[in-house]
A protein has these predicted regions:
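N-terminal Lys/Arg-rich, disordered targeting/topogenic segments
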Residues: 1-10
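Secreted/periplasmic serine-hydrolase-like ester/acetyl group-modifying domain
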Residues: 127-238, 326-383
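Loop/turn elements at helix/coil->beta-strand transitions in domains of secreted/extracellular proteins
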Residues: 53-55, 78-80, 106-109, 236-243, ...
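Hydrophobic membrane-insertion alpha-helices, especially the h-region
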Residues: 12-32
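Histidine-centered active-site loop/cap adjacent to the catalytic His
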Residues: 293-333
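Extended hydrophobic/aromatic segments used for targeting, binding, or gating
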Residues: 223, 229-238, 242-297, 301
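Membrane-embedded segments
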Residues: 59, 63-148
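Alpha-helical transmembrane signal-anchor/signal-peptide segments
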Residues: 33-53
């Protein structure tokens, strides 16, 4: 009898161990099922927009979502827009992203930033892998999503799309982050339309390089031009009204070659009849390296407002972009977003009254983007 009880306890312990062995990874996988960062929030929120309500979509990498504010543009110029942009984005994924853009919207114009074209082969390979995962984490189930998953070359990458534990097991705060996401995503309304800016500025002046008057144009690699021509064919086949752009960057000697590539591509695209908005060639005239940039690649909240106003003015005056008639609820949502964005910039400006060296100590390289922490901070700031 005693022996039987011991065996029973042993079997029970083994059963519990087996259950825990499978249930704990499963529970962790559920908690990491939906990665929540600024990129995921921005892309997921795109599908919350009223279908066929967006006038302009911007496609690009981190310099786009840190340089342009859709709700600020709405407040100033009354057209609707959205940043379908991802950190480390690559032109290799633009075809899939254009499909996603057109799956719910019929924009009058798509503005494509060209910086994602100029990465090295190694940089492109790494950025495609990372960006593809970010897209898959955010986009709804569709044939396009399935094709993205199928395009991975390794079994591990394919499996990680269904079991994110394999992709994010090294991210220690993922569970807590996604628990916050679950409660936040069920209540927020995409108030800031994917806006993103750094708190402190990290600017060094030892390697500045003036580009005023530099017109040298260097042809990119054959592979790069092939990707550009493939993109143009897609835009032509889909009858997409596309304009290209080059956002401002803090120019250094190391980036001069990229600038010269951009000069070539600008001339190439203009000869083919495409519009091209070049904000980099005039960066020294229209932007201040010390006051408008958070680092070498990205504008801060001051520069973001400057560039948004410049883009809005050009699109409305030169490209015929004007507000479309929106359903009443959609119009109220955009007006609400514009008001929240005003509050957001007030909050940002109040933080920036602290000297930059102190901001670095307090915030490090922290960024402001639409999450529960920021929305709560804005509400508290508004009440003070």
């Amino acid at each position: 009898m005693v022996v039987g009880m011991k065996k029973g306890k042993l079997y029970l312990k083994r059963m519990i161990s087996i259950v825990l062995l499978f249930s704990l990874p499963l529970a962790y996988n559920i908690c990491t099922q939906f990665r929540f960062d600024a990129d995921t929030q921005r892309l997921e929120a795109y599908y919350l927009e009223e279908p066929n309500s967006i006038d302009v979509v911007l496609l690009g990498a981190s310099d786009v979502y840190s340089g342009y504010s859709p709700s600020y543009a709405y407040d100033k110029y009354k057209y609707t827009s959205y940043n379908y942009s991802i950190a480390l984005n690559s032109v290799d994924l633009y075809a899939a992203q254009l499909k996603e853009i057109l799956s719910t919207q019929s924009p009058d114009l798509i503005l494509i930033e060209i910086s994602s074209v100029f990465g090295t082969d190694k940089e492109t390979e790494e950025s495609v892998l990372i960006t593809k995962h970010r897209m898959i984490d955010a986009v709804p189930e569709s044939q396009n999503r399935k094709e993205l998953i199928d395009s991975f070359t390794t079994l591990e990458d394919k499996i990680s799309c269904y079991f994110p534990f394999f992709m994010y097991h090294g991210v220690s705060n993922m569970c807590e982050t996604n628990i916050n996401k679950i409660s936040f995503s069920n209540t927020h309304q995409n108030l800031l339309k994917g806006v993103y800016i750094g708190v402190a500025d990290y600017i060094w002046d030892d390697d500045f390089c003036s580009i005023q008057g530099v017109k040298t144009a260097t042809e990119p690699s054959k592979e790069c031009m092939k990707k550009i021509n493939n993109l143009l064919k897609i835009c032509d086949d889909e009858n997409i009204n596309v304009v290209f752009t080059r956002f401002p960057h803090r120019m250094t000697k190391a980036k001069l070659e990229r600038f010269q590539y951009g000069n070539f591509l600008k001339g190439y695209l203009q000869k083919l009849g495409y519009g091209f908005l070049d904000f980099e060639a005039t960066v020294e005239k229209n932007f201040d390296y010390y006051k408008d940039f958070t680092d070498g690649e990205h504008l801060n909240g001051v520069g973001q407002r400057k560039l948004t106003e410049q883009i809005g003015k050009i699109l409305t005056e030169n490209y015929g972009i004007k507000k479309r008639k929106l359903p009443e609820k959609c119009k109220k949502d955009w007006e609400c977003s514009a008001e929240y964005t005003k509050l957001f910039y007030k909050y940002y400006d109040s933080i920036r009254e602290t000297p930059n060296d102190e901001l670095k100590k307090i915030y490090g390289e922290k960024h402001l983007w639409e999450n529960k922490e920021l929305i709560d901070a804005l509400k508290q700031y508004n009440e003070e």
